[in-house]
């Protein structure tokens, strides 16, 4: 019987991941600030015949995260997988952000990942087994305008994870840490993110459904991989940043500004979730079902790499045979 802890599990990707892990036979501990949404997430897990534990807390509180890990091991058993999904953001130009906002985004998105990793690591290393999955973004590699705080925090988490991975390799530890870099996903966060944009925030197209992200997270937990790039926008962003970063600067400067704003004007006085959760009844999906893709061919290819390689070799053999036949 396997146990997984998922932070940020009250809605969006974390909520979809809780269901996906339960479908694979895991008992699931869900962690986030909003107790009501956590109870709903736990009910979905129990409806699938698995045990669930609700852990309402703020991942920026290291002591609370550590105490929660103790509870999980006492009640559900040893933690096999820890998924760091919790994150937050503020939309706006750099000069519009306050020091407090930058601190808060960093605390949740970066320090929350670090605290979750430390809580998992202190339990997994003595057992010499376990997997830590860092839910990241293509923005950890290629930053975009209007989300400087979030991009910086995700890049920091990638640097932290790379260092940890090397330490585990040096010690020949069987504990594994992996990162899943996601594209834009249709989650409820766009309805409650703090924003100073003149128009309502939206995911930068193309957009994917949370179930695509959840499938990638579960696969990364169960298969050895250093990183998993989900969706062609992430792959192109990573490659573009490595090959032609200056060109990418100009591309995102032109495209990402308008692409992150809908045609609807921003609603004045709308509550946001930066400091406190917004009390709304939501699950995994946001309001962009009309444009979100339910699958990713590139993710399928990664998950079936051997079959794809075999098919490619088969096609190559047929082509070589055809050329030889035509020559004769």
Q: What is the role of each PLM region?
A:
Residues 137:
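Residue(s) in the substrate-gating loop at a strand-loop-helix junction
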Residues 117, 153:
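Active-site helix of classical SDR
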Residues 170-263:
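SDR active-site lid
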Residues 93-94, 98-103:
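Substrate-binding pocket helix/loop in short-chain dehydrogenase/reductase
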Residues 26-40:
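Conserved glycine-rich Rossmann-like NAD(P)H-binding loop of the short-chain dehydrogenase/reductase
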Residues 35, 57-67, 99:
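The beta1-alpha1 cofactor-binding region of Rossmann-like NAD(H)/NADP(H)-dependent oxidoreductases
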Residues 10-12:
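Conserved glycine-rich cofactor-binding loop
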């Amino acid at each position: 019987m396997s146990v997984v802890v998922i932070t940020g599990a009250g809605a969006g990707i974390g909520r979809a991941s809780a269901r996906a892990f339960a479908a694979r036979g895991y008992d699931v501990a869900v962690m986030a600030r909003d107790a009501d949404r956590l109870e709903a997430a736990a009910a979905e897990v129990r409806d699938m015949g698995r045990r669930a534990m609700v852990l309402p807390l703020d991942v920026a509180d290291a002591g609370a995260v550590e105490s929660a890990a103790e509870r999980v091991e006492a009640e559900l058993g040893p933690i096999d997988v820890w998924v760091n999904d919790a994150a937050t953001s503020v939309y706006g130009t750099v000069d519009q952000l306050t020091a407090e906002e930058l601190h808060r985004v960093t605390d949740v998105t970066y320090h929350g990942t670090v605290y979750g990793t430390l809580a998992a690591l202190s339990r997994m290393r003595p057992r010499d087994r376990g997997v830590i999955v860092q839910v990241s973004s293509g923005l950890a590699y290629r930053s975009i305008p209007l989300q400087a705080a979030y991009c910086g925090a995700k890049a920091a988490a990638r640097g932290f994870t790379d260092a940890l991975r090397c330490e585990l390799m040096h010690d020949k530890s069987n504990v594994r840490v992996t990162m899943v870099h996601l594209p834009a996903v249709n989650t409820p966060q766009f309805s409650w993110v703090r924003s100073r944009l003149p128009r309502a925030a939206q995911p930068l197209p193309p957009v994917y459904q949370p179930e695509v992200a959840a499938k990638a997270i579960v696969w990364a937990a169960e298969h050895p991989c250093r990183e998993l790039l989900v969706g062609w926008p992430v792959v192109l962003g990573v490659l573009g940043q490595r090959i032609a970063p200056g060109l990418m600067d100009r591309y995102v400067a032109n495209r990402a500004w308008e692409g992150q704003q809908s045609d609807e004007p921003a609603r004045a006085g709308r509550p946001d979730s930066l400091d406190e959760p917004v009390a709304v009844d939501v699950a995994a999906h946001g309001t962009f079902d009309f444009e979100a893709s339910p699958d990713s061919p590139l993710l399928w290819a990664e998950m079936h790499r051997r079959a794809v390689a075999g098919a490619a070799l088969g096609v190559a053999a047929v082509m070589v045979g055809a050329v030889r036949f035509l020559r004769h």
